[in-house]
């Protein structure tokens, strides 16, 4: 009986202990359900995270001190990467903004009141930035979201910002090589140190070396920059509203065009806005800002040159091998939608895994959390899920929520076909816009006056400051998908003029809080002096007619029945262009002017919509 009791006691003990003893034996690890990472209880408590910072040595010296620049990096990882030998992949964000930025006071920007083809007035220099230096945490971004789900989160300040050495170059090579160095360090190919100038090394023994990058705006640009280096270990990037060419950010078709909301900004202004590390400030300001940027960005003509070509990531796509989930808003007039499409198009042509997510809003806006989760789980954890299955393009329709996109075979919609529309006379009121090409339509003249906004001109029933051509009222919705292209034959009474084009839907929707898809369908700008070449402008001969063709922005929008689609041609766009004195006259030859719009269903769909 005594032996039986002893046996029972042992058995009871075994069944009482598993919740503690067996749990202690089981190591924490990522959890996957339906192809997605889940919150791991052992990773959830921030008190159990290891947070450290360090400096990673790069392969460049951008501040002229004779030493390789080091980038300030922070790391947040579950303690199990230290106590249990667990290795996890990395989600990495790099930014020039982490330590703070300069003033947004427009008095330090370039004055938009500038006559065309003239030297601008010197601008005021920014007051020094008072950096926000936090150690060991550079940023808390993405930490609460991804560390509990089985990732290590890494941040770095880009060159010349925060505690990172070097100079900001705003799209220069060092801004690509800096995140490359961090990824190299995560894979044991570069050195990390405990201090910016010491020799005590830090090694990344706690990671698998697989890295995904993400971020918005400038923080979305840097994943593209890193990917163009072809660095091993960077498996996937999810850029949101990235600036992929600084020429396309500050110029359009030869025209000086400011990003929406930042009138007077140029690349040297952005340099001042982000240059938060005061080390070597005088050298960086003199060599990078004044000599390289102001010396070559050309605020007189706006031509494309070697300076701008060196800051266009489309020119560096050859080595790229990371997968791409591109994200943008069709109504982003800060970083316009062409920035994302041109890179997506190039990656698609390379045959790399890629998809694109577009919403109808403005600047920023991540893809749905489930979509990001699946992409990171697939490429960083190796989970076999449906991240790459199904539609190539996910587009949020006009009245849907951002996390409820509609899938399409691709963007542009493969069913979209070009429909060419021709203007008929009507100035100073409204002209027509039709698929019927008629000769002898004559010429119409308008006068530039930057005092009037584009929206006021579009709403005006009578004005001599724009030309406005309107289709018949739509009897059915029209689905536009792709990139409109316009050809204008024009003459000017001066050697230079701004040229702006809007597509709008009429009647104009009056609302104290309009939706992004209300009213303005698309926009485009160009310098008529660049009618032959983007790299060499040519002063216009007053009275002589020139033909210029250029694209508007990528778009996917459904224009509802009851609306009319209108083409507005005007000169200075007060929210984007320079502001010359009013009075320049532009004359448009209607016989030589047309716009091609991409309509899903092509001419048949268009004919049904306008009743023909």
Residue map of PLM features:
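C-terminal, loop-rich substrate-recognition/catalytic regions characterized by aromatic stacking residues
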Residues: 27, 35-40, 366-612
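Catalytic histidine neighborhood in serine/cysteine hydrolases
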Residues: 347-364
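Accessory cap/linker subdomain of secreted extracellular hydrolases
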Residues: 27-30, 40-41, 59-61, 68, ...
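Structural cue for short, hydrophobic secondary-structure segments
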Residues: 91-96, 155, 185, 568
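Catalytic-loop region of hydrolases
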Residues: 25-115, 130-131, 140-142, 431-456
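Conserved alpha/beta-hydrolase "acid-adjacent" motif
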Residues: 333-339
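Short beta-strand/loop motif that positions the catalytic acidic residue
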Residues: 320, 326-328, 332
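Conserved alpha/beta-hydrolase
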Residues: 147-163
């Amino acid at each position: 009986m005594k032996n039986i009791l002893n046996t029972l006691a042992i058995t009871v003990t075994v069944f009482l202990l598993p919740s503690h003893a067996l749990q202690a034996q089981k190591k924490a690890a990522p959890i996957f359900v339906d192809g997605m990472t889940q919150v791991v209880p052992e990773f959830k408590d921030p008190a159990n995270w290891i947070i450290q910072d360090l400096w990673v040595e790069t392969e460049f010296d951008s501040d002229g001190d004779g030493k390789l620049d080091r980038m300030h990096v922070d790391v947040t990882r579950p303690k199990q990467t230290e106590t249990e030998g667990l290795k996890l992949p990395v989600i990495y964000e790099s930014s020039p903004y982490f330590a703070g930025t300069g003033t947004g006071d427009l008095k330090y920007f370039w004055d938009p009141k500038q006559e065309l083809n003239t030297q601008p007035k010197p601008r005021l220099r920014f007051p020094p930035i008072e950096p926000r230096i936090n150690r060991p945490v550079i940023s808390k971004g993405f930490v609460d979201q991804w560390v509990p789900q089985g990732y290590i989160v890494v941040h770095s300040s880009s060159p010349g910002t925060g505690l990172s050495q070097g100079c900001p170059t705003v799209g220069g090579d060092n801004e690509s090589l800096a995140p490359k160095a961090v990824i190299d360090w995560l894979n044991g190919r570069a050195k990390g140190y405990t201090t910016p100038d010491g020799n005590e090394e830090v090694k990344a023994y706690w990671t698998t070396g697989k890295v995904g990058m993400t971020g918005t705006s400038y923080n979305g640009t840097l994943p593209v920059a890193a990917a163009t280096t072809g660095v091993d270990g960077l498996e996937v990037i999810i850029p949101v509203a990235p600036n992929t060419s600084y020429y396309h950010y500050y110029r359009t078709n030869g025209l000086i065009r400011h990003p929406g909301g930042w009138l007077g900004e140029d690349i040297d202004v952005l340099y001042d806005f982000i240059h938060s590390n005061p080390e070597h400030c005088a050298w960086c300001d003199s060599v990078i800002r004044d000599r390289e940027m102001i010396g070559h960005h050309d605020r007189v003509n706006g031509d494309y040159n070697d300076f701008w070509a060196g800051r266009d990531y489309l020119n560096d796509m050859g080595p790229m091998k990371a997968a791409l989930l591109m994200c943008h808003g069709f109504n982003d007039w800060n970083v316009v939608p062409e920035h994302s499409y041109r890179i997506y198009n190039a990656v698609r042509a390379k045959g790399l895994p890629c998809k694109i997510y577009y919403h109808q809003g403005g600047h920023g806006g991540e893809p749905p959390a489930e979509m990001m989760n699946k992409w990171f789980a697939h490429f960083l954890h190796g989970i076999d899920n449906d991240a790459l299955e199904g539609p190539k393009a996910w587009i949020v329709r006009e009245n849907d929520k951002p996390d409820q996109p509609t899938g399409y075979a691709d963007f542009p919609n493969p069913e979209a076909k070009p429909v060419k529309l021709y203007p008929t006379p009507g100035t100073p009121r409204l002209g027509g816009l039709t698929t019927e090409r008629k000769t002898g339509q004559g010429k119409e003249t308008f006068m530039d006056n930057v005092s009037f906004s584009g929206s006021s001109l579009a709403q005006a029933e009578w004005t001599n400051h724009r030309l406005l051509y309107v289709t018949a009222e739509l009897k059915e919705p029209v689905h536009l998908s792709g990139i409109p292209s316009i050809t204008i034959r024009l003459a000017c009474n001066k050697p230079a003029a701004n040229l702006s084009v809007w597509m709008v839907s009429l009647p104009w929707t009056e609302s104290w809080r309009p939706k992004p898809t209300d009213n303005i369908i698309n926009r485009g700008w160009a310098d008529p002096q660049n009618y032959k070449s983007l790299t060499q402008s040519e002063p216009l001969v007053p009275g002589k007619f020139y033909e210029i063709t250029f694209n508007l922005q990528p778009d996917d929008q459904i224009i509802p029945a009851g609306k009319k689609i209108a083409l507005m041609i005007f000169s200075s766009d007060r929210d984007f262009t320079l502001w010359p004195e009013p009075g320049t006259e532009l004359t448009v030859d209607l016989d030589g002017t047309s716009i091609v719009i991409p309509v899903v269903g092509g001419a048949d769909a268009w004919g049904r919509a306008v009743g023909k």
